[in-house]
UniProtKB/Swiss-Prot annotation:
Binds 1 zinc ion per subunit. The gene is alaS. PROSITE patterns: AA_TRNA_LIGASE_II_ALA (PS50860). Keywords: Aminoacyl-tRNA synthetase, ATP-binding, Cytoplasm, Ligase, Metal-binding, Nucleotide-binding, Protein biosynthesis, RNA-binding, tRNA-binding, Zinc. This is Alanine--tRNA ligase. One of its GO terms (cellular component) is cytosol. It catalyses: tRNA(Ala) + L-alanine + ATP = L-alanyl-tRNA(Ala) + AMP + diphosphate. GO terms for molecular function: alanine-tRNA ligase activity; aminoacyl-tRNA deacylase activity; ATP binding; catalytic activity, acting on a protein; transferase activity; tRNA binding; zinc ion binding. Consists of three domains; the N-terminal catalytic domain, the editing domain and the C-terminal C-Ala domain. The editing domain removes incorrectly charged amino acids, while the C-Ala domain, along with tRNA(Ala), serves as a bridge to cooperatively bring together the editing and aminoacylation centers thus stimulating deacylation of misacylated tRNAs. Belongs to the class-II aminoacyl-tRNA synthetase family. Gene3D superfamilies: 2.40.30.130, 3.10.310.40, 3.30.54.20, 6.10.250.550, Bira Bifunctional Protein, Domain 2, Threonyl-trna Synthetase, Chain A, domain 2. The keyword Zinc applies.
Amino acid sequence: MKHLTSAEVRQMFLDFFKEKGHAVEPSASLVPHEDPSLLWINSGVATLKKYFDGRVVPENPRIVNAQKSIRTNDIENVGKTARHHTFFEMLGNFSIGDYFKEEAITWAWEFLTSEKWIGFDPELLSVTVHPEDEEAYTLWAEKIGVPEERIIRLEGNFWDIGEGPSGPNTEIFYDRGEKYGNDPSDSELYPGGENDRYLEVWNLVFSEFNHNPDGTYTPLPKKNIDTGMGLERMVSVIQDVSTNFDTDLFMPIIEATERISGDAYGKDAVKDTAFKVIADHIRTVAFAVSDGALPSNEGRGYVLRRLLRRAVRYAKTLGISRPFMYELVPTVAGIMDAFYPEVKEKQEFIAKVIKTEEERFHETLNEGLAILSDVIKKEKEKGSGIISGKDVFKLYDTYGFPVELTEEYAEDEQMTVDHKGFEAEMEKQRERARNARQDVGSMQVQGGALRDITAESTFVGYSAVKAEAKVIELLHDGQLISEAHEGDTVQILLDKTPFYAESGGQIGDRGVLRSEQAVVTIKDVKKAPNGQHVHEGTVDSGTIQKGASVTAEVEDQMRSGVVKNHTATHLLHQALKDVLGTHVNQAGSLVTENRLRFDFSHFGQVTKEELERIEGIVNEKIWESIPVAIDLKPINEAKEMGAMALFGEKYGDIVRVVQVGDYSLELCGGCHVTNTAEIGLFKIVSESGIGAGTRRIEAVTGKGAYQEMNSQLSLLQHAADELKSNVKDVPKRIQSLQAELKEAQRENESLLSKLGNVEAGAILSKVKDIGGVKVLAEKVNAKDMNHLRTMVDDLKAKLGSAVIILGAVQNEKVNLSAGVTKDLIEKGLHAGKMVKQAAEVCGGGGGGRPDMAQAGGKHPEKLEEALASAVDWIKSVL
């Protein structure tokens, strides 16, 4: 067997299947694009669902990829086992209705055993098949020549995710030798059993059935192949190491951690776990941040926060008690640079994000640990082995402890966490709810007439908004029809069209189709699975027929607004990078005729001054009258030019490059102005945060910007009228009114203070003597808690030595304030305990220091009773 690096194995896999006629699908972003069913891309097939379910027909039905993936369902096992990871790479070859079992099995065996490729000894390979999959069994036994004793039938060899495509699978296992298991009595010592000797290196799924809603299975019209090979696992076999962490994918990170910690890997099992956790988690976080995710308290951002804080916790085992994870980013970038250059390109930004998060956690870690230690001690003293949900939530909400981190500390003390209680607290704090994602099926059922339409349709709308065309297909409710009549809702495909189909954030065009017999209003345009533009509309009059000649005309005013807004988003994107930093990336957009919406990654708020600069830059570029050039270029040439790619989009070998002078350069398939002067004016309407690390700007251009500014001027004029002022004097008038208001508030405070003194003086006659101590417990008039506290302070000063508790009713609620002079504290009198006693009577709570405390209550009618209970408490102490 050859010794290969991880980079060589990855490239060898892609090259092998490229030779077999497969198209190499680039690794997609870890952040799913337009797939609400996934938090992360979690497999090689996840990014190909659109091909498997028929929404899009691939140019080549044979696909191969190396896909970065994240799975977080078993984080607690990472570092404690040989092969659990949160970030990993899946190598896979796929067939969308092309080849099937024979080719998949034959090629897998060739790749693994041929000296040209991996070069495994065939005698060390075994396979598993489903008991009823006779075809796969026969192929392994007769075509490949695997001995029957190394073909194991396992009931679990069936891939099924519920409704949708499913089928049997076959797995290939490598025998690592007797040093990993040689006990004849071990019932799990076989390929497919729970053991370390026989390692699964490849899983081939034969998707040949549809799992129907009623639980039955029917054959698929087009059978698919979906295979998966974990790169880390495969490399561990090739490099002959005991765990994935000992491969060249992880060891440079572990070695860097050794240098930081001064500790050694491979000497102590507990410390080895820490090294592994750190190595795994920094890979995940670095790649996720490079793809636009940022630490937060919800969704995927919460996963990153949890991983970083788990790593910090384990780092303490190695004696590391400072931010350090960010120092490992260049190491991760260096390992993966050959295939994933994005981490290296963004390593400064990634390191900054990680360092900021580490510093934030270190600030609260020690305080949080002290609180947790007290909680654990308290529960143990009570004889309890459970940390309450309230305490877990407090640690999460106040100190940033993920519940899983608290759970790990609890396990160290042989305690458990009250998860139900924690979830109940989370429910009360809905704004901190982690994520409520749509429950969307991960695979749709094959089918639909649109998928089978292969007739070509040409888009001519970049240069024209009107064209003569022929109807090549008509559909109603997803079914092909030959004609449609007045009032019918239809989908129409033309041989050529000026109508843009919704994509890249730009909405589909609206307009009209006219034939000699019919008029059809087009309300929207979308792309069919094979790329044609599907015109959705209603027959206004007459009858439209398949084969009819039509004049297709886009609503000119609508398109005019769209192109202005689309080019403006390109200018805005570059302006954001100029002002906020190069880390800014597009995270989504919407371009309509009336306005534009642009979502972008940024981990801080955008200040008013920054927004003004951004808006100013965009308008300067508009007024410079810059020509907009659009060219088709090879993808590599476009990238070398520095063209920005859109978030989540995938591109072919030839791409459309939109260039605004020397200012903006993007890959884009949308419609644009020919010169920035056509945009006229750009005005930001709003800027806000829409999620962890993602901001949104909404803006208008041209006529819309003019109307927006007029609206703002009208509002300003209305304010001036109300203030009885000129528009230009509005700021001065407001400042003058604010000064008058402050003066009135000061006078009000002074009057209230005087009234308070009067009232305080008036109630001095109500002081009681209890056991030689002056006691005053009275209901008073006070506007708020501050006023009440001031009265208590004044009375303490007047009486010299006294216990005072005052109560007031405000807005149907009770305020209580208590004070004890220093000389009486030594006698056991305590303002906090006294006010707590009173508050409980009127349905509230509170407390404070021995000399000063406050509380609140819900039942004003019980205030007198509450004050009486305070007096009783004083008597009990004295």
